[in-house]
């Protein structure tokens, strides 16, 4: 009886693996076609990098598996980007930066991805929401953070919760190449917020033009 049960289990396992292989065989060409078209478009615009922001929500117990899955996915996209002379960046959300038992989804991605292939874009407000110190993050992943999103609760520099001057200075020291002012939340008319954010950033001593 045990032998029959085991044979059944083995057969089931083979069926599952076969289904997974079929799924992968279907998925990757579709994925590659989409990214090929997207990257060709981005390349035609003169961009030197392309960024993917956050991943679909997942349960805490799936963190390790999701990190393994997305690390492999990011490396495939990074390879396609590299063929076009571009770099691929991953922009983690606050949920992906927040640590559980001392490690975050972002930490796992960083561990699993080749540091020569996958780069990072760090958002100051997402880090704030996650309770993560941006300076420490830049230092921990020195040389791997390609760009920064200067992002505040509303107008950049107005909340006083983030030392943007210090973040920019340390970012440059840690290899950041691109700095972007992000305006997502508005306490004034949108264009007023954008103008004020830009003006605030341009007054910082650390900014290089």
Place the predicted regions along the sequence by residue.
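Active-site acidic/histidine proton-transfer and metal-coordination neighborhood
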Residues: 2-120, 191
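Histidine-acidic metal/acid-base catalytic patches
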Residues: 5-7, 13, 17, 46, ...
